[in-house]
Regions:
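N-terminal small-domain helix-loop-helix segment of the aminotransferase-like
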Residues: 2-99, 106, 282-285, 392
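Active-site phosphate-binding strand-loop segment of PLP-dependent enzymes
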Residues: 144-214
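Conserved glycine-rich beta-strand-loop-beta hairpin in the small C-terminal domain of fold type I
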Residues: 280, 295-304, 316-332, 366
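Conserved core segment of the aminotransferase class I/II
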Residues: 224-298, 302-307, 311, 390
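PLP-dependent enzyme catalytic core of the Aspartate aminotransferase-like
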Residues: 83, 159, 337-339, 343-356, ...
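Generic structural signal for small/hydrophobic residues in well-ordered secondary structure
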Residues: 18, 35, 52, 77, ...
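Helix C-cap/helix->beta junction micro-motif
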Residues: 25-28, 135, 195-196, 226, ...
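PLP-dependent aminotransferase-like
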Residues: 91-92, 109-170, 183
């Protein structure tokens, strides 16, 4: 059977592949410590679980919902935006999806025509480029330098812009680097996008997970002109420990949101009703558990960062948000005789029994990604093994 060129040209998600490999080795009895997947190790808070159970027991979750999401969930998203973004959104400016990843997909399918260019700063989350290609667009990768905390400048963006540029992808806090753009940096980028009539895709999924006094500023909150140029992608997965529930959403101008909902109507229809009722409680219920989880991530970061910096050949920029470390391992590879980062991470997996994610899938062939969304004992032991591997 001949598969489509579309799928043959598609890359496998390196994060999912690394996680699957680690699980397979664990199933064989290997003592694998996996630092691969980007999901909190906490269970979903009880008040959210209870809201989901109630929606099943009283029958509300038994039926289809509107494709773009429950009115109650849209109202909760509006209240959330009023609190954390400083502005209101109308129901027709919101569409809910089966995960933020699917919101991203419908956005690209809704706005990108064949040949349109999408600027993506590198390092980048692994699915951006392939989703652009699925929409027949052209990803244009702009390197964000480590000495600038993995952040691009307006000058770099302007140098990459052509008359085919349609979208700028902006992910802050970033997966995989954990960097956060300042208000001043975002204002400069936002004004540039407005002046050049370039859409901003703001992936804000890690916006509540910031540490050590750093602040998250939503680019869409900076001015009405920037807001109209921006589509915000967010969800409940990372902030509320709900990765398995698969609820994301997009907020933006009504025309784009309607187009995204139209695509969902011909593909997934509505997201799970049970998960939507759970998301209502997540966004509108008590938020104390969010802060306790954030504090736990902050403690892990502050504990593990100096330990990782002591691993020979690992050069680490301390992240400001999300829950990843993204060390440069060029020197480490040279010390161990490797020139390919994927081969290097494979050797670490086989010999040290620590599962990392190759930086190649993030557009960073000299880096690896470690998730610190796991307990401190596991993190300490993993770094201990990495150090022993490098010193052997």
């Amino acid at each position: 059977m001949k598969l489509s060129n579309r799928v043959l040209e598609m890359e496998e998600s390196v994060t999912l592949a690394a996680g699957a490999r680690a699980k397979a080795l664990k199933a064989e009895g290997r003592d694998i410590l996996s630092l691969t997947l980007g999901e909190p190790d906490f269970t979903t808070p009880k008040n959210i679980q209870d809201a989901a159970i109630a929606s099943i027991q009283d029958g509300r979750a038994s039926f289809y919902t509107v494709t773009s999401g429950l009115p109650e969930l849209k109202a909760a998203i509006n209240a959330y935006f009023e609190r954390f973004y400083g502005y209101s959104v109308a129901p027709n400016q919101v569409t809910v999806a089966a995960g933020a990843k699917y919101s991203l997909y419908t956005f690209f399918m809704a706005v990108v025509n064949p040949g349109d260019e999408v600027i993506i700063p590198t390092p980048y989350w692994v699915s951006y480029g392939d989703q652009v290609k699925m929409a027949e667009g052209v990803p244009v990768f702009v390197p964000a330098k480590e000495d600038n905390h993995f952040k691009v400048t307006v000058e770099q963006l302007e140098a990459a812009r052509t008359d085919k540029t349609k979208v700028l992808v902006l992910n802050s806090p970033s997966n995989p680097t954990g960097m956060i753009y300042t208000r001043e940096e975002l204002l400069a980028i936002g004004n540039w996008a407005v002046e050049k009539d370039i859409l901003i895709l703001a992936d804000d999924i890690y916006g509540r997970l910031v540490y050590n006094g750093h602040e998250f500023t939503p680019i869409s909150s900076l001015s009405e002109a920037i807001r109209k140029q921006t589509v915000v992608i967010n969800g409940v997965s990372k902030t509320y420990a709900m990765t398995g529930w698969r609820i994301g959403y997009a907020v933006g101008e009504a025309e784009i949101i309607a187009a995204m909902s139209k695509i969902a109507g011909q593909t997934t229809s509505n997201p799970s009703a049970v998960a939507q009722y759970a998301a209502v409680e997540a966004l509108s219920g008590e938020q104390d558990t969010v802060e306790s989880m954030r504090q736990a991530f902050e403690e892990r970061l502050n504990t593990i960062y100096p330990l990782l910096a002591e691993v020979p050949g690992f050069e680490v920029v301390k992240p400001q948000g999300a829950f990843y470390l993204f060390p440069n391992v060029k020197k480490a590879m040279e010390m161990k005789g490797y020139t390919d980062v994927t081969e290097f991470t494979t050797a670490i997996l086989e010999e040290a029994e620590v599962a990392l994610v190759t930086g190649a899938g993030f557009g960073a062939p000299e880096n690896v990604r470690l998730s610190y969304a796991t307990d401190l004992d596991t993190l300490k032991e993993a770094v201990k093994r990495l150090k022993a591997f490098m010193e052997k």
